A protein has these predicted regions:
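OB-fold and OB-like single-stranded nucleic-acid-recognition modules
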Residues: 19-145
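Sec-dependent N-terminal signal peptides
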Residues: 4-13
């Protein structure tokens, strides 16, 4: 009986660790983006346009799990729309010099309580290669795990 219990716990722990690794790889995949400069008539200057590789395109419209940090956009502790970052607030794209590929817009099913600790979110990944007023990644129908 002890051997069966030990075997079960070993398998459960291995599965948990392998799933955690997969979840953390989402940002790594999303970071494999390149940019090209194009002139924008509305802004009157050249801007960076994202070029999504096949690995990123394969995630478009798919359910993904991402570990990161909530960056509130309103003064509320419970939000349905916010920015999610691969890095803590002081190191994020808006505050610390990381690239735009390290953040995403989040639209959640129900309000998610703010925390400064990292959290896992699951949702449908959308790619944005054309609207300069939005982030390049959006996580729709997100829920906290």
């Amino acid at each position: 009986m002890k051997k069966v219990l030990f075997l079960f716990l070993t398998i459960a722990a291995t599965t948990a660790f392998s799933q955690t690794g997969l979840k953390d790889n989402t940002w790594k995949t999303l970071s494999k983006i390149t940019f090209k400069k194009e002139y924008d008539e509305t802004l009157g200057m050249k801007i960076d346009i994202p070029v999504f590789g096949n690995e990123i395109k394969a995630l478009s419209g798919k359910e993904v799990t991402v570990k990161g940090y909530i960056i509130p956009t309103d003064g509320y502790k419970n939000q349905k729309e916010f920015v999610f970052s691969a890095f803590p607030y002081n190191m994020c794209f808006f505050c610390g010099g990381a690239g735009p590929e390290t953040v995403m817009e989040v639209n959640s099913k129900i309000p998610i309580v703010y925390t400064s600790e990292p959290v896992y979110l699951k949702g449908i990944l959308r790619l944005n290669g054309s609207d300069v007023n939005r982030l390049i990644y959006t996580l729709d129908n997100a829920e906290k795990l």
